[in-house]
């Protein structure tokens, strides 16, 4: 078995450094991925991503075509939801990987075009907001090239099921089970009370057009990279999903339960 390791910090004592050391001690062939490296180019069977949700999302952005299965490795103080194995349990997880005792779960992504130019695919969500806060955004939402609504709001979020417990939920969107084949559209603080969160089949083509605002607007990819948009945002199902390794059989309901418990803990602080 060949394992690639993806991460952002390789200094001594870092999570990536620890993972590499554990694999070396177990005699497992491994390769550290540098920026621009493709896991498939190194004939990797599995990619271990060192870090929390942000690092896993960044790795997903870099892989635009066929995805080598990913297993997120975190440290015990992490509050993320995409990683599955604590680094303290990595040795036993590797033993299961070597025996083939795991499943691969395919999670679809959003293909995103900004003003006709394709940008990085997203795993959680894509959001459209004015660059200056507290500024009204006017736009038209189209589904399969037909106008669905004209809206004035603070912004709009388009989410996948796995992203439904992230920004979308904070803005009033529904929690959606991970294997649901849908997109979620959430208008943020619309002036029209009928602009409730919308669920559409994931074979739909979504467009945000006729964008009007006093200031420049940005498309935000998975809460990270920003791309200036002037006329149109387009979203559809990406041809290639992200493939997650599952050594622990957590259901979608368990992931939602974890999110709810975290919210309760924050409220009680």
Identify the residue ranges that each predicted region occupies.
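Gly/Ser/Thr-rich active-site loops/lids in small-molecule metabolic enzymes
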Residues: 150-194
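Short glycine-/acidic-enriched loop or helix-start segments at secondary-structure transitions
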Residues: 58-60, 81-82, 138, 167-170
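Short, solvent-exposed amphipathic alpha-helical segments in soluble enzyme
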Residues: 18-22, 64-65, 172-176, 201-203, ...
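Short glycine-rich anion-binding loops that position phosphate/pyrophosphate groups of nucleotides
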Residues: 52-55, 76, 162-165
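Catalytic core of DAGKc-family lipid kinases
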Residues: 76-154
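Proline-centered loop/turn at the N-terminus of a beta-strand
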Residues: 67-71
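ATP/NTP phosphate-donor binding region
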Residues: 1-50, 55-65, 84-106, 113-120
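ATP/nucleoside-binding phosphotransfer catalytic cores, i.e., glycine-rich phosphate-binding loops
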Residues: 115, 120, 128, 133, ...
């Amino acid at each position: 078995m060949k394992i690639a390791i993806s991460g952002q910090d390789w200094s001594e004592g870092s999570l990536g450094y620890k993972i590499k050391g554990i694999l070396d001690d177990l005699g497992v062939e491994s390769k550290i991925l540098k920026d621009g490296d493709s896991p498939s180019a190194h004939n990797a069977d599995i990619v271990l991503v060192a870090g929390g949700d942000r690092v896993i999302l960044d790795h997903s952005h870099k892989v635009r075509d066929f995805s080598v299965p990913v297993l997120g490795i975190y440290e015990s103080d992490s509050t993320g939801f995409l990683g599955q194995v604590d680094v303290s349990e990595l040795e036993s997880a590797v033993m299961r990987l070597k025996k083939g005792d795991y499943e691969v779960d395919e999670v679809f992504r959003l293909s995103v075009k900004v003003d006709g130019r394709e940008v990085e695919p997203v795993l959680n969500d894509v959001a459209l907001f004015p660059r200056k806060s507290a500024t009204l955004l006017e736009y038209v939402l189209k589904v399969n090239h037909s106008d669905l609504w004209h809206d004035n709001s603070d912004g709009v979020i388009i989410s996948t099921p796995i992203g439904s417990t992230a920004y979308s939920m904070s803005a009033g969107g529904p929690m959606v089970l991970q294997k649901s084949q849908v997109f979620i559209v959430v208008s943020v603080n619309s002036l029209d009370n009928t602009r409730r969160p919308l669920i559409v089949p994931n074979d739909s083509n979504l467009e945000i057009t006729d964008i009007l605002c006093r200031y420049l607007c940005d498309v935000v990819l998975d809460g990270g990279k920003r791309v200036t948009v002037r006329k149109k945002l387009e979203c559809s199902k990406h041809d290639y999903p992200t493939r997650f390794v599952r050594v622990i059989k957590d259901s979608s309901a368990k992931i939602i339960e974890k999110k709810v418990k975290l919210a309760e803990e924050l409220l009680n602080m």
